């Protein structure tokens, strides 16, 4: 595992055959230029990117259900987008082809596993999830291939 700033990765060009990013792309990958400018140089031609992104069932435009606000503030919720948003951002890449972008079939299992964790973030998420936030949240998976 590598811990590094996604804005300035410490690798040679064409270093990776594939990268996987779980539950963090929504923090830095919302800029349409990010994928091509910051990630593309490190992926070999034909290389893959596999993403698992916390998502919303639909966009709320700042008017969030109360159950979501039990664990997250509006600023945090602005980072959680729906599938259409991610399709638009990811398919705008000039360097990558979006092969797949959809809701994960193991969505409920992923949330249940997360909520069993005893770290402060999982514990903090429980209040919202126990109050119905799972009706609004999902996990989105995406696969891209470098052209």
Regions found by a protein language model. Give the residues of each.
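Short alpha-helix
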Residues: 77-94, 100
């Amino acid at each position: 595992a590598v811990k590094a700033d996604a804005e300035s990765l410490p690798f040679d060009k064409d270093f990776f055959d594939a990268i996987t990013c779980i539950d963090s792309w929504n923090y830095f990958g919302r800029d349409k230029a990010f994928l091509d400018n910051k990630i593309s140089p490190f992926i070999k031609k034909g290389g893959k990117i596999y993403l698992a992104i916390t998502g919303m069932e639909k966009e709320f435009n700042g008017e969030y259900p109360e159950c979501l606000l039990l664990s997250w503030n509006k600023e945090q919720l602005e980072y959680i987008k729906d599938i259409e948003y991610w399709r638009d951002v990811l398919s705008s890449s000039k360097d990558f082809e979006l092969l797949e972008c959809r809701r994960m079939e193991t969505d409920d299992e992923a949330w249940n596993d997360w909520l069993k964790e005893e770290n402060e973030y999982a514990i903090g998420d429980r209040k919202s999830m126990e109050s119905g936030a799972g009706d609004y949240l999902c996990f989105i998976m995406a696969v891209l291939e470098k052209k």
